[in-house]
Amino acid sequence: MKKINFILLFLLALSISTFAQKRTNEGLDTRDLYSDTWVATDAIGRTMPTNAETGDIKDDKRRVVGIFYITWHTQNIHSWKSPYAADVTKILAQDPEARKDTNHKLWQNDAYHYHYAEPEMGYFLSQDEWVIRKDISMLTDAGVDVLIMDVTNAVHYWDEWEVIFQTMQKVKAEGNPVPKFCFWAYNGPVITVVQELFNRIYKENKYSDLWFYWDEKPLLLYNSDPHHNASGGWVENPNPNYYEAAATDPNDPHYNNPDYTQKSLTDYTNEVKEFFTLRNMWWGYYEWAGKQYIGTEDNWSFGYSLADDRILNMSPEELLSTHNGKREQAAVTPAQHPVTMTENPMGVGKSWTRRFGEPQLNEYDMPEVGYIPYLNQVKENPVLYGAYFQESWDYALKGDPEFLYINDWNEWTAMKFNLPPNSPWLGRYNSFMFVDQYNMEFNRGIQPMKGGYGDNYYMQMAQNIRRYKGSRPIPQHLGYAECKIDGRFGDWKHNTIEYRDTHGDTFHRDAKGYAGLHYTNTSGRNDIITSKVAVGKDDISFYVETVEKFTPHTDPNWMLLLIDADNNSSTGWYGYDFIINKSIKSDRLTTLMQYDSEKGEWCHAADIAMRYADNHLELSISREALNLTGDSFTFDFKWTDNPAGLDNPISLCLDGDTAPNRRFNYRMIWRKE
């Protein structure tokens, strides 16, 4: 979304009995992955809160999380000039002086949209099904319920929506949970835009299994007063429903119905008003269209203008939008903008805090040092820590609304605007500016980036959504369960505790990207869906199941099992102390290897029994070898197949399959009785 703003003189327009029940609100065919019981430690040491911190699933009221989902990376962008070099972070890394000169050679003359940094999945386009599947998986794992589709600038992305919604239906048909969707329209001929959405999707009952309902009707976020918007005021709204017979033929079914007789519309049609639950949504200014906006009835915000002291001094409860006097909606953003719409020319970035504002920027327009309130520490490279994001979450959690809106997931690009010489921007005089995002500090993105802050903001979002919604207790294994490693797998039928993973995440990639780029990924191989663990008197046994028959064990990086035996993320290889199947001796014998931190390598620890047949695999490890010999213990584990390498946890995120997804782990808790 591009929010067009005025700057300077410019108009820049959930107790578990058998841990295998389904969530009733997801439907009988949806397979519960229990992602709210997964554990993780992110790149800066923050951990996923468990039931001990969050409490049980909170059922005191509706608790819904929506996220702004961008689809403007359209297919035509593939034809842009190659090679693609419109990446602000890479431009400034080459020559930081480019930040001062709009005519610098590194600013491509034919590029008006720039990435602030490279996405983890490359410079993708919105019809890339591989990316869409990754997005849906990440968002549902984190607890996101609804995608807010962007129509804020009066552009319909019909082709992109078609691919996205069809992909969501495929993922749903595979038994996975998926979010719902709704639309947000605001600027331009918004009445026409909304009518076209209604006519082509809702009236045609397209993708109705994916519609998001609020107060028993599909939700539409819109502009309740089309005479006031961010693109300059009223524009004509042609009526898509108009036809002459409705005005002239008494026998016509719509005779004298103003929804059909007006060539231009000055208000939304009755069918739109009756069909949807409507909520006005725009930026959280203190005043908008001549009256107070923030904290008022039915006026949702997609962020708060914290550069305005009137808003900065409001309590969490005062920031909330209400409906019939009840706290309804709050916004959470990772940052704001490189511009503030105030007399202060400094932006509000990811390291901005209520106490200290934006840290001093270096020659790359990045903060080198900043205060992190939730740590009560000053940190180097503060952008890694999400100071603004956490303050935003803290306020929203205290306000405790029914709907949390997060802005945004995947916008990535922004327009570069030329300015007159000596125009104030980012605390200096400059000849150009970016409004919505600029670099790694000044952006509102959460989707993981390549390098930089990586998936820190995604993990931070998942941590806080769990605090908002609560979570289920991690199931506990009681007593001994002996399993014979014989390739028959019958012992496992009585083990009711399942650790589950997404079905279909070995999908292969073959898609166009920005400016001639083409992305392929055929690493998806063994699609892991279920695993189990059993503790015997002397051994711990593991079982794993895939969708289809296993590929041969001689394949590279085949069905690796990683174990954090000491439950300490700071030891071993990113917390993992042992790995199984890194070296396989035969189809019945594999190895247990232990990580040697001093050598920085995996070393042989023991040979262990393994059997696999069709889509089932089992193996057994001595408890003594894992240092798990007591009457109770806890350890974390994950399966991964065909990662490109074992460089860091992100190595497990993009290639092959990992169960559970990304850097999440399953937690196994056992006691003797």
Model-derived features with residue positions:
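N-terminal module-boundary/linker segments of secreted carbohydrate-active enzymes
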Residues: 21-74, 209-211, 227-240, 252, ...
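Acidic/polar low-complexity flexible segments
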Residues: 475-486, 493, 562-587, 623-673
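The substrate-binding groove and active-site-proximal loops of carbohydrate-active enzymes
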Residues: 38-42, 113-128, 144-155, 179-191, ...
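Aromatic-rich peripheral "rim/lid" segments of glycoside hydrolase catalytic domains that contact
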Residues: 170-171, 418-489
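Loop/turn elements at helix/coil->beta-strand transitions in domains of secreted/extracellular proteins
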Residues: 60-66, 142-147, 174-181, 207-209, ...
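Aromatic-lined glycan-binding groove of carbohydrate-active enzymes
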Residues: 52, 58-78, 223-386, 396-397, ...
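N-terminal carbohydrate-binding/catalytic regions of secreted carbohydrate-active enzymes
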Residues: 48-163, 407-408, 412-446
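Short, well-ordered beta-strand segments enriched in hydrophobic/aromatic residues
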Residues: 487, 538-548, 617-623
